[in-house]
């Protein structure tokens, strides 16, 4: 039976002439038809030939290849995004594996550091502390009325690079690009926001080109009151918004998530998204080895909000697999710069205190050190899994990895710190130190490792496997909150798409070319769980799938019809 593709309805727009060509969401450039050029006062403003989007994308790809540095490629792609968003997403989808590291990590780190230097065109919303009383007016200035996803940062903890001030805007822009490229969320529904509360980065304060508020960061009650003003203004403007907190400092990330997750549909990708993709990866890796996550002993290097968020989700998963909470917590060991977290360690943050080991249980350990180092922990715990979220390069030393491998034939090693310059150990070293036996997943992209004439592809434990699907699922289901169970369903769905589990070989995570398939599956699982949890209206499975299909945007030009304002 012959099938036909349903053609998108024509779009009625009031803009014309140069104004239309300057509107990134609507601009088609050389792809405007002869009729559209006549109807929208574009005749003579474009070259004669009417091109298809694929012809435009081919030209853009050739131009892209002419740039030699990753930051220049990033700037070029951002320029396309700011002039023709449909073409930008067609180009990125055509070359996702090549371009994802350019539009997001690791290249976005350099773009954040150089934000004021390479700034070209406004995108998103900048809300500075001196303008805090104009919050409602600022949000009313956003031209897109149907915003459904906001990614917001205050720029204080950008990747592993620290305080970048308003340069942190590069992260919400990049994240939302992946919501669209991987999760099919229309760019018209997205809004990047930076809360400009000053910066403690003296280099930025002294930089004559820095475009942010030149003031030390506000803190404590003033800071939280400012964030609350923002949240209330967002709720007033877009009551059904999905708000993603991004790259907030450890001291603020968890308090903000705790305070607002039941007030507005929100989540913190550094804490919950990282946890979801990591747990999904570990579920798949355990199944591929014929075991369960509950059977593994896990050591973390880095006990900040991200590391503790991953640990808590691992504990929740192993409880689902049958462990008691106490037994699940005894399998997880958190190490930070002061050593292993124990019940005798002072000044722990509340989210760290739940993850301590009891000193009474460590009396038999083979060590004479008062501070239990990562090597001490690895030597005594004999872990199956080692996870790095320290933001410090080189801390997974050869001695530590070899000690782990001595007791674990197939260790799982996950140096997750971003960007690449902050990774705890390179895949090349880990593979060599374990004689080719480690399963390695990283936070940043790495090329395959060649060791003793064998090729080892390296899985990237990228949050982009998770958050676009969560966003699509929330939009399609109309979920009012994001629950822990919705995040667990995302992890489980990701694990089900593992080539290593399904085929017995290949990467532990799906190929990037399949990421839209994975995102749609996660969207369905998240939407279904939202309905079961009572945070979304119950519908049939068919209706939920139809809602996902209806909300899945594709980078294709639509026919335009002229209308008045």
From Swiss-Prot:
Binding site for NAD(+): 157, 270, 418
SMART domains xrefs: malic, Malic_M
GO cellular component, one term: cytosol
Annotated EC: 1.1.1.38
Marked site: Important for activity: 270
Keyword Manganese annotated: no
Family membership: Belongs to the malic enzymes family.
Protein name: NAD-dependent malic enzyme
Native species: Salmonella typhimurium (strain LT2 / SGSC1412 / ATCC 700720)
Name of the coding gene: maeA
């Amino acid at each position: 039976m012959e099938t036909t593709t349903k053609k998108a309805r024509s779009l009625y727009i009031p803009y014309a002439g140069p104004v239309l060509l300057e509107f990134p969401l609507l601009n088609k450039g050389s792809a405007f038809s002869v009729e559209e050029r006549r109807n929208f006062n574009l005749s003579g403003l474009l070259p004669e030939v009417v091109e298809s989007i694929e012809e435009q994308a081919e030209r853009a790809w050739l131009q892209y290849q002419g740039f030699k540095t990753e930051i220049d490629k990033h700037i070029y792609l951002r320029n396309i995004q700011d002039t023709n968003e449909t073409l930008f997403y067609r180009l990125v989808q055509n070359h996702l594996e090549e371009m994802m590291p350019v539009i997001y990590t690791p290249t976005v780190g350099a773009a954040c550091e150089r934000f004021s230097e390479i700034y070209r065109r406004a995108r998103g919303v900048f809300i500075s502390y001196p303008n805090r009383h104009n919050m409602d007016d600022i949000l009313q200035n956003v031209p897109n009325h149907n915003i459904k996803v906001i990614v917001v940062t205050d720029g204080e903890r950008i990747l592993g690079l620290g305080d970048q001030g308003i340069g942190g805007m590069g992260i919400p822009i990049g994240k939302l690009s992946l919501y669209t490229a991987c999760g099919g969320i229309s760019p018209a529904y997205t809004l990047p926001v930076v809360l400009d509360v000053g910066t403690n980065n003296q280099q930025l304060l002294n930089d004559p080109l820095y475009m942010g508020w030149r003031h030390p960061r506000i803190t404590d009650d003033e800071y939280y009151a400012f964030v609350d003003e923002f949240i209330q203004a967002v709720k007033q403007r877009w009551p059904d918004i999905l708000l993603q907190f991004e790259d907030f400092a450890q001291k603020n990330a968890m308090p903000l998530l705790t305070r607002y997750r039941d007030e507005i549909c929100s989540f913190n990708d550094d804490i919950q998204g990282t946890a979801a993709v990591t747990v999904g990866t570990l579920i798949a890796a355990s199944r591929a080895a014929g075991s369960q996550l509950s059977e593994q002993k896990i050591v973390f290097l880095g006990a900040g909000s991200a590391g503790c968020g991953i640990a808590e989700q691992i504990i929740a998963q192993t409880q689902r697999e049958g462990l008691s909470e106490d037994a699940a917590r005894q399998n997880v060991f958190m190490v930070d710069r002061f050593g292993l977290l124990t019940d005798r360690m002072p000044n722990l943050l509340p989210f760290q205190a739940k993850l301590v080991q009891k000193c009474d249980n460590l009396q038999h350990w083979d060590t004479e050190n008062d501070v239990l180092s990562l090597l001490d922990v690895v030597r005594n715990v004999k872990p199956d899994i080692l996870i790095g979220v320290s933001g410090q390069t080189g801390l997974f030393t050869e001695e530590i990895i070899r000690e782990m491998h001595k007791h674990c034939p197939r260790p799982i090693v996950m140096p997750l710190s971003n960007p690449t310059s902050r990774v705890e150990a390179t895949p090349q070293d880990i593979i060599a130190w374990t004689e080719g036996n480690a399963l390695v997943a990283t936070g940043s992209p790495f090329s395959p490792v060649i060791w003793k004439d064998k090729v080892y592809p390296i899985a990237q434990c990228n949050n982009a496997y998770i958050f676009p699907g969560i966003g699509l699922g929330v939009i399609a289901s109309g979920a009012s909150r994001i629950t822990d169970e919705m995040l667990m369903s995302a992890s489980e769905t990701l694990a089900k798409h593992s080539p290593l589990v399904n085929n017995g070989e290949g990467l532990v995570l799906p190929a990037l070319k399949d990421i839209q398939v994975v995102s749609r599956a996660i969207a369905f699982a998240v939407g279904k769980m939202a309905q079961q949890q009572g945070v979304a209206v119950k519908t049939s499975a068919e209706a939920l799938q139809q809602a996902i299909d209806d909300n899945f945007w594709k980078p294709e030009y639509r026919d335009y019809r002229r209308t008045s304002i």
